């Protein structure tokens, strides 16, 4: 059986801020319809519990201009109203707000004040309209998974491993060893030549004496 995540909301004359409080949400899907239907589903917790909620918002919305940001602790949505006016509550006037929907006092301003927009610096947003709802975010998982194909870079590791054949440059040592061997082999020949030269000098000396 699914559970309901806590949903907080605040508004400005032209937009609504909706925050779904759910830490470490997995497979999150958020859908927004022009008529104002907002639906959410995701799994969370060590047991992978399913969390769902569906709200019929107070009025129509502009899906194309609305944005969503998925964080570690929550999913934050900026829903643009189709008509710039203040809503009496988040859901339709003929409905009672669910128990899990609460006012986000940190972002709330009174209608008379209509303060500045909420500071969203540091948040990464995606457009609802361009993504067909956050369900499209799953596509990002696939895309990132595809980048796992970067594991194909392991092929580079193999290629580089093949360059380990450069270790064959160690063959240079073999060349050096061979040249050393040649030097060592030539030394006895030099000794023999020296001995022959010595004998020749001795015979010359005997000839001169005689």
From Swiss-Prot:
CDD domains with a match to the protein in the record: p23_hB-ind1_like
Pfam families in the record: CS
Acidic residues composition-biased segments: 173-184
Description of what induces expression: Up-regulated in the leaf sheaths of rice plants grown from seeds that were inoculated with the nonpathogenic P.fluorescens strain KH-1.
CS domain boundaries: 2-91
GO terms classed as biological process: chaperone-mediated protein complex assembly; protein folding; response to stress
Region (Disordered): 165-210
GO cellular component: cytosol; nucleus
Molecular-function GO terms, alphabetical: Hsp90 protein binding; protein-folding chaperone binding
Feature: compositional bias, Basic and acidic residues: 185-210
Xref: PANTHER family: CO-CHAPERONE PROTEIN P23, TELOMERASE-BINDING PROTEIN P23 HSP90 CO-CHAPERONE
Family the UniProt entry places it in: Belongs to the p23/wos2 family.
Protein name per Swiss-Prot or TrEMBL: Uncharacterized protein OsI_027940
Native source species: Oryza sativa subsp. indica (Rice)
């Amino acid at each position: 059986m699914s559970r309901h995540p806590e949903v907080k909301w605040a508004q400005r004359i032209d937009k609504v801020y909706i925050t779904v409080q759910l830490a470490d949400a997995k497979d999150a899907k958020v859908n927004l319809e022009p008529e104002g239907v907002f639906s959410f589903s995701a799994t969370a917790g060590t047991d992978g519990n399913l969390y769902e909620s569906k709200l019929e918002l107070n009025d129509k919305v502009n899906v194309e201009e609305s944005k969503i940001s998925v964080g570690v602790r929550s999913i934050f949505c900026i829903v643009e109203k189709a008509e710039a006016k203040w809503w009496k509550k988040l859901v339709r006037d003929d409905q009672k707000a669910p128990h899990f929907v609460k006012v986000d006092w940190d972002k709330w301003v009174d209608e008379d004040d209509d303060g500045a927009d909420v500071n969203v610096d540091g948040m990464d947003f995606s457009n609802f309209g361009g993504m067909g709802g956050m369900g499209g975010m799953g596509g990002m998982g696939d895309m990132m998974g595809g980048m796992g194909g970067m594991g194909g870079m392991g092929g580079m590791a193999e290629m580089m491993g093949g360059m380990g054949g450069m270790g064959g440059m160690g063959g240079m040592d073999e060349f050096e060893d061979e040249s050393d061997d040649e030097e060592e082999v030539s030394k006895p020949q030099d000794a023999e030549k020296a001995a022959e030269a010595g004998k020749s000098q001795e015979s010359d000396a005997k000839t001169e004496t005689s």
